[in-house]
A protein has these predicted regions:
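Residue-level recognition of the N-termini of beta-strands and the immediately preceding loop/turn
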Residues: 78-82, 112-114
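Active-site beta-loop-alpha junctions enriched in small/polar residues
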Residues: 20-22, 50-52, 85-89, 117-120
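Glycine/proline-rich, positively charged
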Residues: 41, 88-131
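N-terminal binding-site loop/beta-alpha segment at the start of enzyme catalytic domains
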Residues: 1-80
Length: 131
C-alpha cells in the first residue's frame, strides 16, 4: 500500500474504500459487511463513509465489519483510518456534536480519525470548525 505524507508528517493510505450506496438496503447488509471485511483483508487501511450514506446505514456496515475484523484477525484499530462526514444541515456547533456522537455509535468507535463537512451549507463555517 502506498502512503501520502501530510504536511503534519502523518501518513495516510493513498487508496481507500468508499462506502457510498452501502447501508441503503437491509437485504444487502451481509454482502456489504463482507465486502468491507474483504477490503480490510486485502490491505485497505482507509475507509470513507458519511452520515448521509444509507441514512447512517453505511456507517453501521463499516462499524460491524471493522469490529469483526478486529476480533477475528490481527488488525488493530490504530492501523485503520476512518473518515466520515457531517451533513450541512447538521453543521451548527451543537449539530456537529450530536451528529458526531451518532456516527461514533454507528461506527462502534470512540474516535473518528478525519471528520469532514460533506459540503458547505448555511451554517457559519466558524461554528462548524469550533465543534
Amino acid at each position: 500500500m502506498r502512503f501520502v505524507q501530510l504536511p503534519s508528517g502523518e501518513k495516510l493510505p493513498a487508496l481507500g474504500l468508499g462506502t457510498w450506496r452501502m447501508g441503503e438496503n437491509r437485504r444487502s447488509r451481509a454482502t456489504e459487511v463482507a465486502a468491507v471485511k474483504a477490503a480490510l483483508q486485502m490491505g485497505y487501511r482507509l475507509i470513507d463513509t458519511a452520515e448521509m450514506y444509507g441514512d447512517g446505514g453505511a456507517e453501521e456496515v463499516v462499524g460491524e465489519a471493522l469490529h469483526d475484523e478486529m476480533l477475528t484477525r490481527s488488525i488493530s484499530r490504530e492501523e485503520v483510518t476512518i473518515v466520515s462526514k457531517v451533513l450541512p444541515s447538521n453543521a451548527s456547533h451543537a449539530g456537529v456534536l450530536r451528529a458526531c456522537e451518532r456516527s461514533l455509535k454507528r461506527l462502534k468507535l470512540d474516535v473518528i480519525d478525519i471528520y469532514l463537512l460533506h459540503w458547505p451549507g448555511s451554517a457559519p463555517l466558524a461554528d462548524t470548525v469550533a465543534a
